[in-house]
């Protein structure tokens, strides 16, 4: 369940 949260934050971090 935390995997989905990390994915979202990862995407935003890489999209910066």
Swiss-Prot record:
Keywords: FAD, Flavoprotein, NAD, NADP, Oxidoreductase, Redox-active center, Stress response. Its cofactor is FAD. Induction: By oxidative stress and catechol, and very weakly by heat shock. It is an enzyme of class 1 (oxidoreductase). GO terms for molecular function: oxidoreductase activity. Binds 1 FAD per subunit. Coiled coil: none annotated. Its EC number is 1.8.1.-. Homodimer. Belongs to the class-II pyridine nucleotide-disulfide oxidoreductase family. Serves to protect the cell against DNA damage by alkyl hydroperoxides. It can use either NADH or NADPH as electron donor for direct reduction of redox dyes or of alkyl hydroperoxides when combined with the AhpC protein. This is Alkyl hydroperoxide reductase subunit F. It comes from Acinetobacter calcoaceticus.
């Amino acid at each position: 369940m935390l995997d989905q949260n990390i994915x979202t934050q990862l995407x935003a971090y890489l999209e910066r």
